[in-house]
């Protein structure tokens, strides 16, 4: 379900409330690289406040594609994380509800948040599979 909605979102490219900021930051990174402060957006703001990872990925792949891939990946990771602990039916229901939430964030353009959720889920999954060092690194990456 999430993959279908993400593909439609990419294809139709609807305007979303938060997408403009992510497109701006990605384009800015593409022009000047990492920057701490920018005066061109509503009188100035600090760029690292949203994400250190999203602008370079957005500049490389495009903000919409990064958001769509993060949405799909987070649903897959969530399902893998809960599968060992719940029945197949409960896992499926939880994954569908999680996908609905992820799709809502995608539709409004909260792309940096979606990428952070994906990295956070990677961290928790690594910890659940007894890879504490990987979980630590991903947890730190999630916080940036």
Residue ranges of model-derived segments:
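Early transmembrane hairpin of solute transport permeases
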Residues: 39-41, 56-92, 97-98
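Helix-to-loop transition at the C-terminal end of transmembrane segments
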Residues: 8-21
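Start-transfer (signal-anchor) and selected internal transmembrane alpha helices
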Residues: 1-7
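Short hydrophobic/aromatic helix or loop-helix immediately within or flanking a transmembrane segment
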Residues: 31-65, 142
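Membrane-embedded helix bundles of polyisoprenyl
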Residues: 72, 76, 80, 90-130, ...
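Hydrophobic residues within the alpha-helical transmembrane core of Major Facilitator Superfamily
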Residues: 7-8, 57, 65, 96, ...
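Transmembrane helix interruption/hinge and helix-loop junction motifs
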Residues: 13, 60-64, 87, 109, ...
């Amino acid at each position: 379900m999430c993959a279908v909605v993400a593909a439609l979102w990419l294809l139709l490219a609807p305007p979303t409330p938060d997408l403009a900021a992510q497109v701006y930051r990605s384009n800015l990174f593409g022009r000047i690289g990492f920057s701490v402060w920018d005066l061109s957006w509503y009188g100035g703001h600090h760029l690292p406040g949203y994400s250190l990872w999203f602008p370079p990925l957005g500049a490389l792949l495009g903000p919409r594609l990064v958001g769509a891939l993060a949405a799909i990946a987070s649903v897959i990771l969530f399902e893998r994380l809960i599968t060992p602990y719940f029945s197949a039916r409960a896992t499926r229901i939880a994954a569908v509800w999680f996908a609905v939430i992820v799709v809502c964030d995608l539709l409004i353009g909260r792309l940096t948040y979606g990428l952070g959720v994906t990295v956070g889920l990677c961290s928790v999954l690594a910890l659940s599979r007894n890879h504490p060092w990987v979980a630590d690194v991903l947890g730190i990456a999630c916080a940036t």
